[in-house]
Amino acid sequence: MDGVCKSPQRLLFVLVSCFGLVQSYKNGLVSSVCGSMMPNHGANAQISSPPFTVTADKTTFKEGDQITVTLNSQTGYQFEGFMLQARQVGSSSSIGTFSVTASNMQLLTCDGVSARSVSHTSNSKKSSIQAKWTAPTSGQLGNIQFSVTFVKSDDTFWVGVKSSAVVYNGAGTTGTSTTPATVAPTVASIPGCGTTKVCFSQPNNCDPTTSTGCYFVAVQASSDQSEMRIEMFGPADGYVAIGFSDDQQMGNDDVYICGKDNNGNLQVQHAFNSGRSRPAILSLGNVTDILTAVTNGNINCSFISRNTISTASRAATTNEYYLMIAAGSSSQGNIQFHTNKYVTSTKVNLLNPSVVITSEEEFPPMVKAHGCLMLISWMATGSIGMIIARYLKGVAKGQGCFGKDFWFVAHVSLMTLSIIATAIAFIIVFVSAGDWAGGAHPVLGCLVMILSLIQPIVAAFRCEPQHERRFVFNWAHSCNAFAIKCLAVAAIFTGLALFEEYDSDGWMLKVMGGYLAWEALMYILQDLNLRAKKKDSQLCSCEPMRPETILLFLFIIGNLAFLIALLVGIGSA
């Protein structure tokens, strides 16, 4: 110190240098930190969610395009200084040039190129800033992001606040409101699962980079849960979504959707799911670093969210949630009912990195009960009741109970059981799901239920067997029964397909195909026997074992064999 004091020239030099250093930041002349964008204020950058955002007015660009970039602050906040650059995604080098018109902004030279960056001219308070960026007219261009350093005060600043990615397409296509789809490698990945992030996938432990039919989500949360990196991946033609829920049912959930807009580009949306209708789309909020891709039919997204997770329409105070994956189709940018849904079996602590393994009880017991009741209704009681009414009216004719023939009592009893079981199955699956699942299966199931209820109502008002109009009822009753049977078989096929989404062998569908062939064979044999009887009028009606009775016995044994196989399959699904 004495040396400095004894040398007035040296003291003057130090004072001028310090003064120049301070002034250089107040007037925004910060070209020396173009690479790091880090203010030399002697303080560390903030890691909390910034109260400032940077947005672009376009989502795609080509050579020579101009993009308006806006820096905004949240209500109640202002910034004194800033530094703005455009950078290719994953690069630390600036690209393109800026132009400004306002007096509170200036252009800086970075990487030896003028107008590569924009900064402030004074430390006056600012709420919003706009600048125009012009893309290069040549060179190796790629997707870009606008990166900003916001200075709230000398010791409070945020570095590297990024906009959503702007896609280079070289064809001049621009967008106005959606996050574009980038053509990139898989952005959701296994590395870090269990060590730095929570991962949930179906099938368990599938790898989105190598597995087929893999649905995958990952969440990497900061220690105070103010920031989360979210990854989503799944085979879908419309969207993949992740939900944060307080329970295992859809409703009152915080949701992020990675789906196609009306131009076929991927967009990330923030939504709140009420469980009874299409999720309500919210403002995207503080979401940055968006990367999206479609690879081999798989939708693929990652982004950083600084939004608070909100369930039951209020901000949650916990870090434990059930994670949900949903996927399905979209139409004109609107998501449709999901065709695939998976939920963790327990709540997941987002601050505790783990690999979530769901129990083998993939399908809720009520869904399995629904499937079993439907199979029993239309592979056993319903099928047997129908074949008795068609081919066994002559067996034990004149004998019966309650004044009715045995065939009639058996037919009515079996069909009544079928309708009751169908109604129970219909109710419990809606109670379990809580909403409309979408797809062909529920439509077919509703048609089966409606026509099944019509059948006994019409039968209750039928005319006497000798009435001249009786044939009208007979034909209507038979045609409706045939329609119910066809729809029920189709519903079973589509239902089994839902159980077998990850069974590459698909054995239950093959068993159902075998059952269909078996039943067709039995009907053909019964019909041939009926025709033979009509030709041979001398056939004794009192034979101890008539051919139709033997065929009925075989029919029941075969149906039960197929039924038991499918019941076992559903039970172990």
From Swiss-Prot:
Q: Could you say which enzyme class this protein belongs to?
A: oxidoreductase
Q: Where is the Reelin domain?
A: 15-181
All copies of the Cytochrome b561 domain together span: 332-532
So where does this one cross the membrane? 4-24, 369-389, 414-434, 441-461, 479-499, 506-526, 550-570
Q: Where in the cell is it found?
A: Membrane
Q: What is its EC number?
A: 1.-.-.-
The record places domain DOMON at 213-328
Membrane topology category = Multi-pass membrane protein
Listed as disulfide-bonded, the cysteine pairs are none
Which residue positions carry a glycan here? 286, 300
Which UniProt keywords are given for this protein, alphabetically ordered? Answer: Electron transport, Glycoprotein, Iron, Membrane, Metal-binding, Oxidoreductase, Transmembrane, Transmembrane helix, Transport
Q: Can you cite an annotated GO cellular component? A: membrane
Where is heme b 2 annotated to bind?
411, 477
Protein name as it appears in the record:
Putative ferric-chelate reductase 1
